[in-house]
Amino acid sequence: MAQREGIVLSTEKKGLMRNQKIETRNKNEASEKQRAHWGGVFAMTLCVFALIASEFMPVSLLTPMAHSLNVTEGMAGQGIAISGAFAVMTSLFISRLAGTLDRKILLLGLTSMMALSGAVIAMAPNYLIYMAGRALIGIVVGGFWSMSAATAMRLVPVHRVPLALAIFNSGNALATVVAAPLGSWLGAVIGWRGAFFCLLPVAILAFIWQLLSLPSMPVTRQPAGAGNVFTLFRRRVVTLGMLGVGIFFMGQFTLFTYIRPFLEAVTKVDASAVTLILLVIGMAGFIGTTLIGRVLKRGFYPTLMAIPVLMAIVALALIAFGSQAAIVTALLGLWGLISTAAPVGWWAWVPRTFPQNAEAGGGLMVAMVQLSIALGSTVGGMLFDHHGYRSTFLAGAAMLIIATVLIFLTSRADASAGDHS
């Protein structure tokens, strides 16, 4: 009898525990649904689109901007360099400077600064004011991207974070497709200042959407200082990898920043043809972004090494066939296909290399990429102004080959480490 009662009690206890587990699971599911702010994710994606378009708009408008501001094309290209420099500083120190400020307020402030930057650039009476406007967009780039992963983690459940980040990146991919050709077309129709003014309503819409859809994101404690980021370099795979990604993006933007002057002066195409070629680059880049994930699964480091090798070959081929429009268009289509896909691969490298510290690794990646963009556009501008396009393209190709070697060494260091920490 006692044994039977014990069995009954045990059965009741198991049933109670099962019910509690079901209730807990239901509460967790309900909590996850409550924490999913997809409207905020899409609002930030619109902000990404406007941000990328703002950052690289000068590439498609370099010639008319240089003429209007009475500077060389190389000097006009320094607008990309200064935005990269300010993005580096911001990405490293924004967490400490923002302190416990609600991250929603911080994101809204950055979006407002993006709109202000567009207005300052569009109305810039001289080169100095233009550069000040470019510095503002650099602050926004560094602040926004360094917080993107952490913000995604607060907007959606943990298992949905990769999807949220992929949606963010779709704004990036869309901007690469339409921003350059649209900027070139708008520049021909309403002038380069009008093209920058067109970014204002997009930034304002992104601000309003974020204001309505983002939840409050308070910070209860002061984030770790920027100094902790640099301790990541103690690992050989990090040092080599960051050098590889840095030289890669430096080589890319040494060449690509000055593609419009090359098309006009060497290939001898008009503004409408420039717009078409930039559209080809963007569309190819969108395709590359959608395909790169599958390719990376087949061979991660071999893919990262193949990208700069192919880009270096394209750079050399552009020198050889620069006067033939059809070949140049095909070569730049290949450039867009592989170069736009490269950031996806390198962002996949971050959680692979920093599984326990992805946010710090992401901040370091933003700083390295933006610093490289700044250096690349600066070096490219100096070479373009003083030695012509051949030296610019040769320098870009050389950097891409060096990046390939560094990526190979990174893969060896990663393999010898055996695991990621």
Enumerate the predicted regions with their spans.
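Helix-breaking motifs and short loop linkers at transmembrane-helix boundaries and internal kinks
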Residues: N70, D102, M123-I129, F321-S323
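Conserved MFS/SLC helix-loop-helix module at the cytosolic interface between two early adjacent transmembrane helices
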Residues: M89-P125
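C-terminal transmembrane helical hairpin of 12-TM major facilitator-type secondary transporters
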Residues: P302-W346
